[in-house]
Amino acid sequence: MQFLVDTHTHTISSGHAYSTVLENAAAASQRGLEMFCVTDHAPTMPGAPHFWHFANQRVIPRLLHGVAVLRGVEANILNIEGEIDLDERIINQLDWVMASFHEPVFRYTNKSDHTQALLNVIRSGRVDAIGHPGNPNYDFDFESVFKEAAKHNVVMEINNSSLSGSRVGSEIRCEDIAMYIKEIGGRITTGSDAHFAADVGNFESVEPLLKKVNFPIESIITRHSRSFLDFLEERGKKAISELAHL
């Protein structure tokens, strides 16, 4: 099982990450990736960049060190209404929008609130993926959220950093998430959640988990660049002409 796209990476602009876009691209190339997404934290996260940072990603070349670069964000889920912290104008300029719960922005409360927030953000049509849903601090109703995600063509992320200790208790939940999504015929994305270049494309904990549950490779949108670009186009994103050869 191999994943040639990393849909979750951070740069120094996130405030608590330590590499540049160029350094991440070089690391991605060394890992043999075909593509990675730049997904810095959106403005409400402490230390995160101004919204201009996201609007100006258009200056980033589409290919760096022979690796395709997609322009994205890890937005914050703000409330149970499912609002996120970037406006429509900027979101429409980005290739890839993830939304995640983060403790400094949305303090965990109860299963009902978390479920309602996820359902609303999925229904909003503004996000392509839910980041690190395996975080045990944010319990939610798997059945309703995953079925709604499949209905709206929003994918759940299996996050390598969560499986490597950054969110204690995520291992069992991520396995349960993968098994449930497999059962309903849904799809997932895989992200390193790299905060340092050496971790870009690091799926050493994701791969054995997905093998363990026998997750179908065709339901993993990050298996190669074309499967990922096809997913974005399914979601109504404009084809990226510079990457048409992939």
Curated annotation (Swiss-Prot):
Family matches, as Gene3D superfamilies: Metal-dependent hydrolases
UniProt remark on cofactor binding: Binds 3 Zn(2+) ions per subunit.
Pfam families: PHP
Intrachain disulfide bonds: none
EC number: 3.1.3.-
Keywords annotated in UniProt: Hydrolase, Metal-binding, Zinc
Positions of Zn(2+) 2 binding: H16, H41, H195
Domain of life: Bacteria
Family per record: Belongs to the PHP family.
Record protein name field: Probable phosphatase PBPRB2022
Species of origin: Photobacterium profundum (strain SS9)
